[in-house]
């Protein structure tokens, strides 16, 4: 018997576009995790049309940061700026590949810091975004947010929009967080998450919340509970304390607290200023890892 081979339907390839930032002359590139997640192949195209196949060094879904590597040398790269020094009203530029319009640059100002959006639903999510009005659209994700000196202050990650296109508000992972994540992925293969060992009150402190909790403090981090034998407990932090500063930097909100803590490794000692009974008290806290000790965690740790 003779016949025809059955018709087959090829599964169409899906392609996505995004942006990235070269951060070393030997080819390390930062982008967003959501840009490369579940990709089978990643191609990096430079402004001069040179193409490289990239490999994934590591990812951190909690911050939506991914680190790629291409085999090249002598590449131009961006220097990091200290994102803690960014000021409200400061002029910034967003650089990227929106709608595949290569090397598009838009301008705006910093309109807020330590913004939390709730777009990452994971329990370990870390959102402490820089907010800007520089136009960011699909394809910009993973691209650079730079200051007037051309230094990297953030990785463009998200927009707030009812349509999916720019409507005035865009958000970037601060460079201090991205830099620490990248360093950890390069050195350890995983992100070293430092924990203080407290439960925070679910809402920001306001006069109404403060009255409910029985505290006079209307800003800061209210310590709802302290984990036994955790870093905070060992340092003398108590339930009902209000954290006001970390290493001298004022803390008003949960994203500010998370953003500062994200800069440190387990085993680091930080100075924490708490308000207790109307008085300020400075305590030295030795941060722990997610397993409750001060060791750095190997990526194969189980």
Regions found by a protein language model. Give the residues of each.
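Serine-dependent protease modules
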Residues: 1-235, 249-268, 275-280, 286-302
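Conserved catalytic motifs of ABC-family nucleotide-binding domains
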Residues: 240
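Conserved "HGTGT" condensation-loop signature of ketosynthase/thiolase-family condensing enzymes
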Residues: 243
């Amino acid at each position: 018997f003779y016949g025809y081979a059955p018709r087959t339907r090829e599964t169409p390839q899906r392609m996505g576009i995004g942006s990235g930032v070269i951060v070393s002359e030997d080819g390390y590139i930062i982008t967003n995790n959501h840009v490369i997640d579940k990709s089978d192949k990643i191609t990096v195209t430079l402004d001069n049309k040179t193409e490289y196949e990239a490999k994934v060094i590591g990812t951190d879904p909690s911050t939506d940061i991914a680190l790629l590597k291409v085999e090249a040398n002598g590449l131009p790269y961006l220097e990091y700026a200290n994102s803690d020094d960014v000021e409200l009203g400061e002029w910034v530029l967003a650089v990227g590949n929106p709608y595949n319009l290569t090397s598009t640059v838009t301008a705006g100002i910093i309109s807020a810091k330590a913004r939390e959006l709730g777009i990452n639903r994971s329990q370990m999510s870390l959102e402490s975004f820089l907010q800007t009005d520089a136009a960011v659209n699909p394809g910009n994700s993973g691209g650079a947010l730079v200051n007037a000196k051309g230094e990297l202050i953030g990785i463009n990650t998200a927009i707030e929009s009812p349509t999916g296109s720019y409507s005035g508000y865009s958000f970037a992972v601060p460079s201090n967080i991205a830099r620490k994540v990248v360093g950890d992925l390069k050195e350890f293969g995983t992100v070293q998450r430092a924990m203080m060992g407290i439960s925070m009150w679910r809402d920001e402190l306001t006069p109404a919340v403060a009255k409910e909790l029985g505290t006079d403090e209307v800003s800061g981090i209210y310590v709802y509970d302290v984990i036994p034998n955790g870093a905070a407990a060992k340092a003398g932090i108590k339930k009902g304390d209000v954290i006001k500063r970390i290493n001298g930097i004022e803390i008003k909100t949960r994203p500010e607290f998370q953003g500062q803590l994200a800069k440190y490794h387990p085993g680091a000692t930080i100075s924490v200023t708490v308000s207790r009974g109307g008085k300020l008290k400075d305590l030295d806290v030795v941060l722990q890892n997610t397993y409750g000790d001060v060791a750095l965690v190997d990526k194969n740790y189980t």
